[in-house]
Amino acid sequence: MNQPIGNIYIVVAPSGAGKTSLVAALLQAEPSVELSISYSTRQARKGEIDGQHYHFIDRAAFEEMKDRGDFLEWAEVYGNCYGTSAPWIRGRLEAGRDILLEIDWQGAEQVRKVFPDAIGIFIAPPSIEELERRLRGRDTDTEEVILRRLASARAEIDKIAEYDYIVVNDDFERARLDLISIVRAQRLRSAPQCRRLADMFRRMGTAGAK
């Protein structure tokens, strides 16, 4: 079986760093990249749509999927479980699709054990002070939750060297372009390009067809 052409992009960021908005902007600019929809046991928030934001399931169904080995990765965060469908990911990669996973650092470590070539991208805030300002500006969390998120952010930033790319979200437009550039550059790497363009090189009668 030929190595799948598709790439896996893992995007990780502390809460409040702007990951969700940046990922949405990337998907709009690069519609060929498919977002993996995670399964979650938490309650849907206002405006969230089942199957679009998450696949919302109860704890028993989640445990059943986990026991079957259906999750490429899973984690429990603040009492709620989140998981990524392994069959869906493998099917899309084998079809040559690029997949984006918007997950936490625990999930990223699990995915890279299975797919060591997965591309890790960390979205960093310009400072902890700015991150705190953004978290407080959302006006959705208690003081306890904000402090817990800030502590988690420091722990995540400690692992920043494990990622392939670091995007600092101090200016949204610049960060958006940085994220798009990563995806476009990865597609132009020699190995995947040789597979995609094998027929073209073969017609040229060149070694690029190998």
UniProtKB/Swiss-Prot annotation:
Per the UniProt record, the source organism is Chromobacterium violaceum (strain ATCC 12472 / DSM 30191 / JCM 1249 / CCUG 213 / NBRC 12614 / NCIMB 9131 / NCTC 9757 / MK)
Q: One short Pfam family name for this protein?
A: Guanylate_kin
UniProt-annotated binding residues for ATP: 13-20
Q: What sort of enzyme, by top EC class, is this?
A: transferase
InterPro entries under this entry? GK/Ca_channel_bsu, Guanylate_kin-like_dom, Guanylate_kinase, Guanylate_kinase_CS, P-loop_NTPase
Q: Catalytic activity, per the record? A: GMP + ATP = GDP + ADP
Q: Which domain of life is it from?
A: Bacteria
What are this entry's molecular-function GO terms? ATP binding; guanylate kinase activity
Q: Which PROSITE patterns match?
A: GUANYLATE_KINASE_1, GUANYLATE_KINASE_2
The compartments listed are: Cytoplasm
- GO annotation, cellular component aspect: cytosol
The free-text function statement in the UniProt record for this protein reads: Essential for recycling GMP and indirectly, cGMP.
PANTHER family noted in UniProt:
GUANYLATE KINASE (PTHR23117:SF13), GUANYLATE KINASE-RELATED (PTHR23117)
* Domain named Guanylate kinase-like: residues: 6-184
Keywords from the named record = ATP-binding, Cytoplasm, Kinase, Nucleotide-binding, Transferase
Q: Which family does it belong to?
A: Belongs to the guanylate kinase family.
List, alphabetically, the CDD domains matched. Answer: GMPK
- Spell out the protein name for this chain: Guanylate kinase
